[in-house]
Amino acid sequence: MTISPPERGSDAKSQVEKVDNPATFELFGKPGHFDRALAKGPKTTTWVWNLHANAHDFDAHTSDLQEVSRRIFSAHFGHLAVIFIWLSGAFFHGARFSNYSGWLADPTHVKPSAQQVWAVFGQEVLNGDMGAGFQGIQITSGLFQMWRAWGITSETQLMALAIGALVMAGLMLNAGVFHYHKAAPKLEWFQNVESMLNHHLAGLLGLGSLSWAGHVIHVSAPVTKLMDAIDAGQPLVLNGKTIASAADIPLPHEFFNQDLLAQLYPGFSAGVGAFFSGNWAAYSDFLTFKGGLNPVTGSLWMTDIAHHHVAIAVMFIVAGHMYRTNWGIGHSIKEIHEGQKGDPLLFPATNGHDGLYDFMTNSWHAQLAVNLAIGGSVSIIVAQHMYAMPPYPYQAIDYPTQIGLFTHHIWIGGFLIVGAGAHAAIAMVRDYDPAKHIDNVLDRVLKARDAIISHLNWVCIWLGAHSFGLYIHNDTMRALGRPQDMFSDSAISIQPIFAQWIQNVHAAAAGSTAPNALAGVSEVFNGSVVAVGGKVAAAPMPLGTADFMVHHIHAFTIHVTVLILLKGVLYARSSRLIPDKANLGFRFSCDGPGRGGTCQVSAWDHVFLGLFWMYNSLSIVIFHFSWKMQSDIWGTVNADGSVAHITNGNFAQSAITINGWLRDYLWAQAVQVINSYGSNTAAYGIMFLGAHFVFAFSLMFLFSGRGYWQELIESIVWAHNKLKVAPAIQPRALSIIQGRAVGVAHYLLGGIATTWAFFHAHILVVG
């Protein structure tokens, strides 16, 4: 720790400025008010596109970093308000239009639904039989499972949450207005990183986890224990009364009664005395370390989850006391940065991390890039944990929800990581001052960019040629009727020995790292089959040649995505082709007339290309997950204990050829969506076709040039002039960048909605 004399701590002073900036709606009536050229109003149709492109580009409105910071801060409150309204809608649907109580009573047979279609012109065909006499649309968001884990036992509680979320939305909107128009933080407040770290670590994460642990201990754990006992057919008795249904469970405030809780968890009778006397073992019945899954619900033990949040809280509250603020003790981020000098042999940046502190505290794009990269990676990690360590009751046997949650978190992660590339490039163009980064680590990376990119390119070629080559070989051998010459588990076997070793290590490590645990970290790692209601909740995942092959396709596509994004960042300011790129900005179509071959080279264009490869990459990831789970994990458990998998284990033999992926996965599993008309999944059939159309529409923007459209427009304008109906606003073809933006947006929207319909129609029927 860097300890310094007391005078090094800065004195506390007001970091908020009283401003008189009246909140008015007048500006809403002046489109383009933020830009002098746009404020004059539209002369051509390009105006509306520039309006959309620049409305949120605060850097373009003003160069005052304090003003930009205040706008972003205020917008965050607006964003939170929208989130609370969205949450309120989810709670309201659960309270008003759902079969939540019916699902709670029989979660293994009743399907979750929170929407019923009104019969206006025959749409009621979409209302499927959810069980227990309820007709509706099946939801796959995991909300019911999450609500049960929270301890919600009735629709009345959901309605209270819906109202509470609206109140919170109102508070957030008010805070957003107040902190921009009345009392706005000064720039130094936004740049006070030590205070921010202390508050975010100890406050948001530490006390946030502690308060959630309190909820889990005092509400979730007792409620889920009572619910689990009902579901297991062995209801518990509280105060002499048998708790036979959700309606019998005490309301959350009744659990303030320590004696009531002690009947479920005797550790509560120890009170807080055990905490202060160090007798923490007294709490071991509600702060557990069991490991594995609850056999009744197929989810993590609620008492393990409580223990986890207590531990996280302790860690982060400690972490929130590490940084130097008004007292001269603790870490200084600037000193930590400037203390990093690099390795003279491996990384000879003589000035180490000098200049990075100022870059990260003056460039919000640089800060955002780091946060998006981390946030995106965390989202992808969450996707993996949702099936390997399912946290919510009955989530693991709701296969449509499991595919939905995996796909959702994978795609969110992909978009955030591409966003990281975008904002890193913007930071390089707008905020990077070469004079402040002489021979530091960032400067050295930029100097080595040719070596980095050419090596990464070589890796991509190697991975692509070899991984695709394995498939080409297998397709050729299968086409020629030579299965004995294929790469497969039964012929030329290529086992993923490293992945299998990791599985074994995880399975074995739990015994030494958590000796009192009852089970391992995850059943996926060489565990055992956990069945709930006759369905597989979790099971060991066998890995073989097919997994080895598709994993190297993943490696290839992910490396190409990284190559595109990293090249965009490292060459954002200059390149051999365009040495003065920084002067042209983040997005430009070409380097002016007379410079052939300089189009589509801006940092923006790298983000554009990166989005396609991100989509490519993650489509294969979600297809792999969906097929692997249906083939080797998910299914029904027979009376003799054997498992009948949904696709009968066909992954190992079919996923080793391209034809197998097309025939036994895409085509075989598209049966339900193609044949959905007239059934309750018909909407997915229409969506499947509609999304294909949106995808095809995108190609019109991606495969034709601007000149083509300008010629067409001029011909159409001529016809309008002939009829004397010429528009006052002159029509213009989209610019190259506008056209590519419209194209990629529809490409991704069409692709994602097609996949959504394909997954849902199939798994809702077979899952």
Swiss-Prot record:
Residues the entry annotates as binding chlorophyll a: 700, 708
Role of this protein: PsaA and PsaB bind P700, the primary electron donor of photosystem I (PSI), as well as the electron acceptors A0, A1 and FX. PSI is a plastocyanin/cytochrome c6-ferredoxin oxidoreductase, converting photonic excitation into a charge separation, which transfers an electron from the donor P700 chlorophyll pair to the spectroscopically characterized acceptors A0, A1, FX, FA and FB in turn. Oxidized P700 is reduced on the lumenal side of the thylakoid membrane by plastocyanin or cytochrome c6.
Cellular component terms per the entry's GO annotation: photosystem I; plasma membrane-derived thylakoid membrane
Catalytic activity: reduced [plastocyanin] + hnu + oxidized [2Fe-2S]-[ferredoxin] = oxidized [plastocyanin] + reduced [2Fe-2S]-[ferredoxin]
EC number: 1.97.1.12
Note on how the cofactor is bound: PSI electron transfer chain: 5 chlorophyll a, 1 chlorophyll a', 2 phylloquinones and 3 4Fe-4S clusters. PSI core antenna: 90 chlorophyll a, 22 carotenoids, 3 phospholipids and 1 galactolipid. P700 is a chlorophyll a/chlorophyll a' dimer, A0 is one or more chlorophyll a, A1 is one or both phylloquinones and FX is a shared 4Fe-4S iron-sulfur center.
Keyword Heme in annotation: no
Protein name: Photosystem I P700 chlorophyll a apoprotein A1
Highest taxon listed in the record's lineage: Bacteria
Location(s) in or outside the cell: Cellular thylakoid membrane
Assembly, per entry: The PsaA/B heterodimer binds the P700 chlorophyll special pair and subsequent electron acceptors. PSI consists of a core antenna complex that captures photons, and an electron transfer chain that converts photonic excitation into a charge separation. The cyanobacterial PSI reaction center is composed of one copy each of PsaA,B,C,D,E,F,I,J,K,L,M and X, and forms trimeric complexes.
Gene giving rise to this polypeptide: psaA
Annotated source species: Synechococcus sp. (strain CC9605)
Positions that bind [4Fe-4S] cluster: 590, 599
Binding site for phylloquinone: 709
PANTHER family from the UniProt entry: OUTER MEMBRANE PROTEIN, OMPA-RELATED, PHOTOSYSTEM I P700 CHLOROPHYLL A APOPROTEIN A1-RELATED
Disulfide pattern: none
Annotated GO MF terms: 4 iron, 4 sulfur cluster binding; chlorophyll binding; electron transfer activity; magnesium ion binding; oxidoreductase activity
Binding of chlorophyll a', residues: 692
Enzyme class: oxidoreductase
Chain segments annotated as transmembrane: 72-95, 158-181, 197-221, 305-323, 364-387, 403-429, 451-473, 548-566, 606-627, 681-703, 741-761
Its membrane topology: Multi-pass membrane protein
